[in-house]
Amino acid sequence: MRHPASRLTLLASTVAFALAAQAAPSAADRIAGTELIARDALFGNPERANVQMSPDGKYLSWVAAVDGVLNVWVAPADNPAQAKAVTQDKARGIRSYFWSYQPDTLLYLRDSGGDEDFHLYAVDLKTGQAKDLTPFPKTTAQVAGLSPKHPGTILVGMNDRDAQWHDVYKVDLASGTRTLLEKNDAQIAGYIADADYTLKYAQRSRPDGGADVLRRGANGAWEKFDDIPFEDVLTTSPGGLTLDRRTLYFTDSRGRNTAALFAIDVASGKRTLVLEDARADVGGTLADPATGKVQAVSVDYLRDEWKVVDPAIRADLQKLEAIGPGDVSVNTRTLDDKTWIVAYSAAEAPLVYYRYDRPAGTLTKLFSARPKLEGKPLVPQWPVEIASRDNKTLVSYLTLPRSADADSDGKAEAPVPLVLLVHGGPWARDSYGYGSYNQWLANRGYAVLSVNFRGSTGFGKAFTNAGNGEWAGKMHDDLLDAVQWAVKQGVTTQDQVAIMGGSYGGYATLAGLTFTPDAFACGVDIVGPSNLNTLLSTVPPYWASFFEQLAKRMGDPRTDAGKKWLTERSPLTRADQIKKPLLIGQGANDPRVKQAESDQIVKAMQARNIPVTYVLFPDEGHGFARPENNKAFNAVTEGFLAQCLGGRAEPIGKDFTGSSISVPVGADGVPGLAEALKGHTQEVKK
């Protein structure tokens, strides 16, 4: 017979547990006191973005919407209020544009439906006419050179003759006439031209994954100039020539770990170190627009820092850095170097653009990219260094919701659900700065952790090369180690972590739910590959120069051993292990990760009666460029995560309006999705 005291203790414990469970607030409850930021403010069209100035200082330009579609606007430099749209895109929108040195002429790139077959267009501001300079089907234009000495022409690489390799043409901006400069029969990956459009240097990939740097010989033939071993090929490359052709800049990690910038005297071959940093590779540069001489170099370890190498601009950069505690970048400098267009961003503030009058030393605020976010409860981002299980340092970025960090000190006061947001590439990196996804997720009640796992770039070649052969291996271990760090720091608990990402981040999501099926509460895969064999067998043809690197870093699909390895590391192989909710987003025109990658794993899950929600956009590619589609997918994601992690969710409402969203499978898996689709009229715009 049980002792009465034991029975009483058991009853008291049960009641206490029930009361505790009932009292535990959800992530949505805890964030309820913070104003909800509308998805439209975060993911709709920016009011103004990509602000530039023409080289002659005559015009100010930016990208802004016309009837909901992004186009290029131009205004007199001294009167932005007189701006007018100079492009008339009515479908996908224009995001990438730049000025030529020809007065009154700008250029822009546009593809169709995300297929990445980019055409190059020239716009004559006097006539308002746009001309397609690359009017060839299935051709991807690559801008190879612009020169103030030849303002009426531009160098363009085109692969219309051979889909794998780009020939180089000089193109007349007014007529569109192209003149062949180099028929690429030598399988050249890229060229460097001087200011007179003479091709001086080139780079060619080798079967061992390394590369040869070539120089034009006296007889006009290419001859070997330098050798880049495979282990250095992602961190070593020739940069550009100064306008006087006397100096070649070269980023180089050979004989060292982090990539440094060198200046090579073309006549003597003497190499001079310009800048190095033991923590991180050198990044962007600021060059004198009249000479091409490098004046400052950026290094991004925890934060992006500008290192001055020419004292002539030291005072200028000090003035820019005084804008605030965030990061600054220089978008454009006029040819006379009197005016700079500067972008300033902090994690808790979207981009703000300034005009810098260099002779006067004064800054004038121009525009905020997203003024709708001014005064909204945006939160800081905290750079952190996380130790992996084998003692590698994983530079990462933590964003905490106000419900977990009321005093904004970067230390969690109580655990909240966490979204592990994995970057794509994987040969890329996460950096400090404003991120719409980080702010969105934090505003819904989640902590967000972005991790630079091994294989990421920017931290030296050893860290990048440590990812070779480690898809679903040590690269994934790094993500798991980062989650454990967050648990130990009190940011979250083991049972309330979601994984989410695009491209490689989508693969990491699928790997997380298949290779480690108990590690995550749910996953959001955006254009992620599920089958590494089919991924590598369907890459775009113009990736030929990069393919040997892919084979060495991932696995070689041309060999039996490589196929076996790739099969073992493919989430599709382990689809039967999925037991947590999965949301998949895919663009039907993706040239990198084909729609079949998502189709395959969805079909495998259906065959095993495993639930999945599959969202497909017929007018998108590798990611969702149209704001209508991006908002639509994020509306679905928000409901999905709220169901999984308990954060708050703004109703789908009208966020499908104008989008091409379709849900072939699993519309009933996300609250409100099936109902929202019933009244939706699909709008496909390529």
Where are these regions (language model features)?
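Mature N-terminal segment immediately following signal peptide/propeptide cleavage
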Residues: R30-D67, N71-V72
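Conserved beta-strand positions that form and line the central face of beta-propeller blades
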Residues: A41, Q82-V86, D132, L180, ...
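Beta-propeller domains
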Residues: W62-Q88
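Bacterial Sec-dependent signal peptides at the C-terminal "C-region" and cleavage site
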Residues: L19-A32
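Cap/lid segment of the alpha/beta-hydrolase catalytic domain
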Residues: K372-A498, G502-S503, A508, S530, ...
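Gram-negative bacterial Sec-dependent N-terminal signal peptides
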Residues: R2-Q22
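Peripheral, non-catalytic segments that deliver or gate enzyme domains
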Residues: N45-A49, D67-V72, D89-R95, S100-V395, ...
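Active-site-proximal cap/loop segments of hydrolase catalytic domains
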Residues: F453-K686
